[in-house]
Regions:
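N-terminal FAD cofactor-binding segment of flavoenzymes
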Residues: 1-14
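Short beta-strand to alpha-helix junction loop
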Residues: 16-41, 168-179
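A structural motif corresponding to the C-terminal end of an alpha-helix
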Residues: 42-49, 187
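A conserved short coil-to-beta-strand element within the FAD-binding core of flavoproteins
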Residues: 50-65
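Glycine-centered tight beta-turn/hairpin loop motif at sheet-sheet or coil-to-beta transitions
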Residues: 68-71
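Central helical "cap/lid" subdomain
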Residues: 73-128, 190
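Anionic-ligand binding region
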Residues: 123-152, 156, 164-166
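Flavin-binding catalytic cores
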Residues: 148-153, 158-204
Length: 206
């Protein structure tokens, strides 16, 4: 649907799978302008308040009252929480059905590093899936053709097993970031002295 609407496009190019796992559908779709096009498309006709902290949410018989840190009160017929299940249970427990609270939902951590290499030649590879205990996947952001850059931009994704061991201290311990990058350098041959930017994000529940 969103492909026909030209909100999404096919991510073409070579997607290397070094795990040699058989895939039935190799077509990969990505947002034409970014990763959040699905959210933007389905909320484009809805009023929004960005960078507003929610202080309280209360149900008033017929509607919800959402109080923001600006003291503004937003009234709504429905409230949708988009947060991990463990956090949802804490912040909305009194509004949730008991059956929902008893669900056994497994959330897994993820650590991702964005890294840029100066003046690297564009290589004909869009993504690489690794058979490794630390680094499992890397995406060539240049191959998505959302922008033009003389630098080589990559997103590196950790394995779930390794993320479980590292998620609680990745911000303070630079060895976590360095390990992901080191693995990528070893696999691809990119040079460490060409790195001009690196940034790591972690999600305890993903």
């Amino acid at each position: 649907f969103l492909y026909k609407k030209k909100e999404m496009k096919i991510w073409d190019g070579n997607h290397l799978d070094l795990t040699f796992e058989k895939k039935e559908n190799n077509i990969k779709f990505i947002g034409k302008k970014g990763n959040n096009v699905i959210c933007k498309y389905y909320t484009k006709k809805i009023r929004k308040n960005f960078q507003s902290q929610v202080k309280s949410i209360n149900y008033n018989k017929h509607f919800w009252e959402i109080k923001l840190n600006t003291e503004k009160i937003v009234k709504a017929r429905s409230v949708i929480f988009t947060c991990p299940y463990p956090q949802l249970k804490k912040i909305a427990r009194k509004y949730l059905d008991k059956k929902f609270l008893k669900l056994k939902i497994t959330m897994e951590p993820n650590i991702t590093t964005m890294v840029a290499f100066k003046n690297q030649k564009n290589i004909p590879v869009s993504s690489i899936k690794f058979n490794d205990e630390v680094l499992t996947w890397a995406a060539n952001e240049n191959s998505k053709k959302r922008f033009k850059s003389s630098n080589s931009l990559w997103t590196l994704q950790s394995s779930v097993k390794w993320a479980k061991k590292s998620i609680n201290f990745y911000k303070k311990n630079k060895n976590v970031e360095n390990m992901l990058i080191s693995k990528f350098l070893n696999f691809t041959g990119f040079k460490k002295n060409k790195i001009i930017f690196k940034k790591t994000h972690g999600w305890k529940y993903s």
